[in-house]
Amino acid sequence: GPFAFKLWVENTKLVLRKNPIYYKQDQNGIQLPYLEAVAISFLPDKQSEFLEFSQGNLDFISGIDQSYKDALLTAQGELHPDYNKRVYLLKSPFLNTEYVGFSLQEDRPEIQSELIRKAINYGVDRKKMITYLRNGIGLPADKGFIPKGLKGSGERVIYPYDVTEAKRLVDSFKLLHPEISPKLTLSTNAQYLDLCEYMQTQLDQIGLDLAIDVLPPSTLRQLKNTGGLELFRASWVADYPDAENYLSLFISQNFTPNGPNYTHFQSREIDSLYLEAMRVQKDSLRWELYKLMDQKIMQHAPIIPLYYDMAVRFVSKKVIDLGINPQNFLFLERTRKR
């Protein structure tokens, strides 16, 4: 690769040095990479990261956080004028879907009922969520789990924001279970508390009581893998740019802890369509199968897709040709620094 390991100080810093025998050259015959070294800092939280960046100690930061988004971004998702002279903004569609999942191994009627699961999908205004909580960064995830930009992603809105329909579904559940006042607990970490509180307010309007349990990230991951949660906030970033990567979360052979099916959703039809898609040689036919699978999965509503994310980088103007890509990989081979 273009860089080689030089130094690692645990929880503090990782240093990579230019590889003197790297095989690539630019169009002028100059050996790549241009940079002599890369230093990666390990910081305790996003606020510390932002402060280091503001003080000029970091050359770029990636992603947005509630603690600093309003300082760096306008309400329309553009770079704040205060930073125009020394920072530039890079944005790209990101192969990441943020969602809330149901643990379907839980036997509580509220979890098992498609009425409640669909009601929540109808009852969350994703557009407002993007506007007010994300400063316009991202797209409402209302067309399925596969993010926009991947072949096989949906074209039709499956769950538009519809309070009337959401209330009707909740009322239908209450008629079937008059002894139950539906209540659910959503587990998250502190970074996404604002998003979960937004959902809590929205669902209160349709007659659902949503409690929020804030857990350390490590505990949340462990319980998500073992099925110890009712609802959980999660994200799925593609390992490779193919929609199969997203659909694998709903295949019965991938139940956690042996695979990424955190919801324990199970459908013979989906399993069969998945195997068929893996056998198909023609890309266009496989993409149509992906689209069909996504639609059928969402009809059962094992998850609530919230938004399709965007990759965002705030970069010092001292840095040239950093670039950005849909998987948010960091390619520094041709990057320079003034």
Predicted regions and their residues:
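Alpha-helical secondary-structure segments
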Residues: 1-2, 32-37, 55, 85-87, ...
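Aromatic-rich, solvent-exposed beta-strand/loop patch
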Residues: 1-48, 72-96, 164
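Structural transition elements
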Residues: 2-4, 139-173, 192-194
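Ligand/substrate-recognition segments at binding pockets and active sites
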Residues: 10-12, 138-139, 172-239, 311
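Short helix-initiation/N-cap motifs at beta->coil->alpha
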Residues: 39-51, 64-67, 190, 213-222
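Ligand-binding "clamshell"
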Residues: 71-90, 227-229, 242-259, 316-320
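Extracytoplasmic/peripheral linker and loop segments enriched in polar/acidic and small residues
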Residues: 115-118, 130-133, 209-221, 225, ...
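Long beta-strand-rich cores associated with HINT superfamily self-processing modules
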Residues: 313-338
